[in-house]
């Protein structure tokens, strides 16, 4: 069976709260690590989330 075009990733909060979002990304269009501002409900602020592996 062929490998899919999208990888599942985990967006980990840079506020060190342990909160994360799971999403997927297209390997071909975004080969680098993703970073985005998202809401962290633990600190109740928008913080930078960085891509990490799903274990």
From Swiss-Prot:
- One Pfam family assigned to this protein is Ribosomal_L33
Q: Which Gene3D superfamilies match?
A: Ribosomal protein L33
UniProt-listed SUPFAM superfamilies: Zn-binding ribosomal proteins
Q: What PROSITE patterns does the record point to? A: RIBOSOMAL_L33
Q: Which GO terms describe its molecular function?
A: structural constituent of ribosome
Record's GO cellular component terms: cytosolic large ribosomal subunit
| GO biological process annotation, one example | translation
Per UniProt, which keywords does this protein have?
A: Ribonucleoprotein, Ribosomal protein
Does Ribonucleoprotein count among this protein's keywords? yes
Annotated family: Belongs to the bacterial ribosomal protein bL33 family.
- Note the NCBIfam families from the entry: PRK00595.1, rpmG_bact
- Check the record and name the HAMAP family matching this protein: Ribosomal_bL33
The protein depicted here goes by the name Large ribosomal subunit protein bL33
Which organism encodes this protein?
A: Xanthomonas campestris pv. campestris (strain ATCC 33913 / DSM 3586 / NCPPB 528 / LMG 568 / P 25)
Taxonomically, what lineage is the organism? Bacteria, Pseudomonadati, Pseudomonadota, Gammaproteobacteria, Lysobacterales
Gene name in the database record = rpmG
């Amino acid at each position: 069976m062929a490998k899919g075009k999208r990888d599942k990733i985990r967006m980990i909060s840079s506020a060190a709260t342990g909160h994360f979002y799971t999403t997927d990304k297209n390997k071909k269009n975004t080969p680098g690590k993703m970073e985005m501002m998202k809401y962290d409900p633990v600190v109740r602020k928008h913080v930078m989330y960085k891509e990490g592996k799903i274990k």
